[in-house]
A protein has these predicted regions:
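Peripheral, non-AAA+ core regions of ATP-driven protein-machinery
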Residues: 1-161
């Protein structure tokens, strides 16, 4: 996923780990005031019919010391969790930037106009990213950069196999 600090774009790596244990969802690298993302993502995934893992689920957002905007990382969080179970119909997520929020009903709202999507996508392209997933409502703002596939989604179901 990507975000900006003072207008400078940078990428955030999202990694998901599912291990045996009691059901629990931990998010590392998110500020304490942004912890509500866990409940929103879990509710959204369950609403669209995804069975939440009955084990310990850990989301790691790197670098942990960089600030993250919850409105830009919730969709990436949901995609990571769904991908660990093989329910995502998009191959090679390692070369993909995922931007956006997710509502409790699974819909993907537009990214705020204060985010310079063109700069974020250009920075991602310069880092070798080949695909960007973002809200369908933001496709026009994203443009059509050379060498980057842009995928717009309206709902988490758009990503399921």
């Amino acid at each position: 996923m990507g975000t900006t600090i003072a207008g400078n774009p940078y990428l955030i790596q999202a990694a998901e780990y599912i291990t045996p244990g009691l059901p629990y969802f931990a998010a590392i690298g998110i500020d304490d005031e942004d912890r509500h993302i866990r409940e929103r993502v879990q509710t959204a995934c369950e609403t669209v019919g995804y069975a939440w893992p009955e084990c310990r689920t850990t989301l790691l957002l790197l670098p942990t010391n960089q600030p993250k905007r919850p409105g830009l990382c919730a969709l990436a969080t949901a995609v990571c969790i769904m991908a660990t179970a093989g329910t995502i119909g998009i191959p090679d997520l390692e070369n993909t930037v995922i931007l956006g929020d997710v509502e409790a009903d699974g819909t993907i709202p537009p990214i705020g106009e204060d985010v310079d999507l063109t700069a974020l996508i250009e920075h991602a392209r310069e880092q070798g990213i080949q695909r960007v997933i973002l809200p369908a409502a933001d496709l026009a703002q994203a443009g059509r950069p050379d060498g980057v596939e842009i995928i717009g989604v309206e709902n988490l179901n758009d990503l399921k196999r």
